[in-house]
């Protein structure tokens, strides 16, 4: 992977080696069938919601908030890790693109970094209560399965501000926060910006 930086017409090139990782397999059994394979009656809803999420992640603003060190949005136990293969009731599904942080229902969720809210929805099919924040130049964070969404689209949020509460909405098996980080449509390991 090569990065090129140009400052005052001086070009600097940095090369980083991308290492191969081994990902966990996470098996979850005993789920209601609707949590594993959604009924056809909700396919249009899911497609519309996925398009809206994609649009919120595609924003390329001039904000510079991505430069600050991000903080953990909620205290709890990490119960799901980035990249783990999900097998639901024996059926392989997409890898997990975030970290799950198990916490008590109603626990306050802080903004991991300063930014502007680009999505604030109470009830998406898969992710339930969902907030997406733009931190600049394609970097966004997603907070999912919220019981309460306490911000609105367009709000400018400071790092550490309360944006919602932990819940178990959408396709969820218990109270937790699914926290994700993206660079446009590329999913990043949230631990890479938290450490």
Regions found by a protein language model. Give the residues of each.
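Catalytic cores of peptidoglycan-degrading enzymes
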Residues: 71-195
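Polar/charged, compositionally biased leader and regulatory segments
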Residues: 2-87
């Amino acid at each position: 992977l090569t990065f090129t930086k140009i400052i005052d017409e001086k070009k600097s090139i940095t090369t980083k080696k991308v290492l191969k990782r081994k990902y966990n397999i996470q098996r979850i059994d005993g789920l209601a069938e609707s949590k594993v394979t959604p009924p056809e009656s909700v396919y249009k809803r899911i497609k519309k919601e996925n398009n809206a999420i994609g649009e919120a992640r595609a924003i390329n603003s001039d904000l510079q908030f991505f430069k600050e060190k991000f903080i953990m949005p909620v205290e709890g136990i990490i119960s799901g890790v980035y990249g783990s293969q999900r097998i639901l009731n024996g059926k392989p599904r997409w890898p997990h693109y975030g970290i799950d942080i198990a916490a008590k229902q109603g626990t306050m969720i802080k903004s991991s970094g300063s930014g502007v809210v680009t999505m604030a929805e109470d009830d998406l099919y898969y992710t339930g209560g969902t907030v997406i924040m733009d931190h600049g130049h394609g970097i966004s964070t997603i907070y999912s399965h919220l019981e309460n969404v306490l911000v609105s689209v367009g709000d400018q949020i400071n790092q550490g501000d309360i944006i919602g509460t932990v819940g178990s909405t959408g396709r969820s098996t218990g109270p937790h926060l699914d926290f994700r980080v993206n660079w446009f449509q590329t999913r990043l390991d949230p631990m890479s910006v938290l450490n």
